[in-house]
Amino acid sequence: MIELRNLTKRYGDVAVVDDVSFTMQPRSVTAIVGTSGSGKTTLMRMINRMTEPTDGAVLIDGEDNRSLPPHELRRRIGYVIQNHGLFPHRTVGENIATVPNLIGWDKERIAARVSELLELFQLDPSDFAGRYPHELSGGQQQRVGVARALAAEPNILLMDEPFGALDPIIRTKAQADLLAIQKRFGTTIVFVTHDMEEAIHLGDRIAVMDGGKVVQYASPKEILSRPANMFVDRLIGTGDRPFRYLSLSGVGDLVEQGEASGAPIARDASRRDALAELLWSGRDVAPVADSAGARLGIIRRARLIAEAARPA
């Protein structure tokens, strides 16, 4: 658990982060979102003391993060930046092994961990471990950057605009990889983004920052349905809000008995994807199938549209 208590960072008379308090639960994903200059990166960097607070405290599992030397704290907390930050003169395997080497793991354990992480990120160790960063694509470099941050088995992973430099297709894959890895290891993830769509997609909770303050800290559903003020409302946007809301839930519990023709919609599809398919194909109803292709019932376009309305 990460607890921020009255956290403040001033540069002269300017409060870049101003009296921020909230708690991030273990094994969760927290998105810190806001416009440029809102204080989001400074806030995150105070968790691992890359930036020291002026006032307030950061507690990690009840322990003040100032009780450990900064270098030791940072070895326990994974950190990923936008442009991967890989050492260009080291191979992929050597990059991933950086922190395990620093903390004294033996060679066999390091080699096993490097191979495990490369396989998890679908990078064949026999092919990629000996490559250098310049021999990788942008998406591969970013995956290696995340693997390096996870190498020493940290409980916490901090990520600063981790997907901002990736093209849309690679970005979607990288986001899916991150959620799969988080589910496997149970890592507590805190990431900074200026993209509300990304925050809604990845975050269990979202902290919205404006002018150094957290103006709302809530679940994606609450952020979408009950924005705290006009700033949050504008940040969400109105044009595709219903679709964003639908993206948070699956179609499984909306399936009705009945039959319909045409290509089926997967039971684990989001309501947003299901509605998009029905609109695009011009259908009012579609069959729903499980992963084995067995028909489970039907989903109606009218029901999905009704679910997109703002909750009362």
Label each region the model flagged.
Residues Y217-A218, R226, I298:
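ABC ATPase "signature
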